[in-house]
Amino acid sequence: MNHAITMGIFWHLIGAASAACFYAPFKKVKHWSWETMWSVGGTVSWLILPWTISAILLPDFWAYFTSFNASTLLPVFLFGAMWGIGNINYGLTMRYLGMSMGIGIAIGITLIVGTLMTPILNGNFDVLINTHGGRMTLLGVLVAVIGVGIVTRAGQLKERKMGITAEDFNLRKGLVLAVMCGIFSAGMSFAMNAAKPMHEAAAALGVDPLYVALPSYVVIMGGGALVNLGFCFIRLAKVKNLSVKADFSLAKPLIVTNVLLSALGGLMWYLQFFFYAWGHASIPSQYDYMSWMLHMSFYVLCGGMVGLVLKEWNNAGRRPVGVLSLGCVVIIIAANIVGLGMAS
């Protein structure tokens, strides 16, 4: 496995670790509605950071974006909006299925759809079947899905042991939402594929290869922001017990603390895709669709490890922790199989 591929896998791991931790600051926000908190954090992660970093990287911000026609920008934006719909469905999936089953089904589906649909859409799926490297990466995807399934099982054992149940368990509704979440969340993978002309244009302007994907986030995350912020604003306007005015009528020190914590959560959320861009740039172009598989499987891996560090599994017993550890090992093996496939 060459150095570039190793570093690509490493950067995806760092990005996934940030994704697994990003909600920790949000949990410390007090006396705010989820909608206000999510809007503040989202404004930082989907609007302020992508625009600011792009303005720093590009020699002429407006000239860069106006150089593309609608046929280039619209698919990127719409796939970003598609991914934003997946974000909203993610929370509803957890509500109706519980954390473990919801994450397992949603992540498993988005891992498969986001990874394999890209080469199919590009007309390159035969490369996966007819080459040794392609077959190795397919095997890696299969092993990763198995690893996600094992971690999901560990979570179910933990929830059963600790008496944790879904907020409003509904198997049929939860499964429909989980499938929708998995499919729509793959929009980020499709958006990155559609944004290749933007990456190439950034490279032509002298942007470092590690950073060429970052300007496209202005459009991708703009689509996600439209859906997420629109959802939050509609709820804040229509739901009687939600009020932005009430949220910002608290004591000033608490408001400042809540804003800073939400902004920190937004920063950590953005960093997952900052390092995703680094990992994506380090992987051979013919296998760039594997970025999504690495990101999502590492997200599950890091989520389990963060849970252990935060002692969320202390009262779960030895068996769930053992199953979790096995699942993490399987995901690590999957990443190595994919790495070897890309290097062959």
UniProtKB/Swiss-Prot annotation:
Its main location: membrane. It catalyses: L-rhamnopyranose(in) + H(+)(in) = L-rhamnopyranose(out) + H(+)(out). Pfam families: RhaT. It is a multi-pass membrane protein. It comes from the Bacteria. This is L-rhamnose-proton symporter. Keywords: Cell inner membrane, Cell membrane, Membrane, Sugar transport, Symport, Transmembrane, Transmembrane helix, Transport. GO terms for molecular function: rhamnose transmembrane transporter activity; symporter activity. It is found in: Cell inner membrane. InterPro entries: L-rhamnose-proton_sym_RhaT. The chain crosses the membrane at residues 4-24, 38-58, 72-92, 101-121, 137-157, 175-195, 214-234, 259-279, 290-310, 321-341. Uptake of L-rhamnose across the cytoplasmic membrane with the concomitant transport of protons into the cell (symport system).
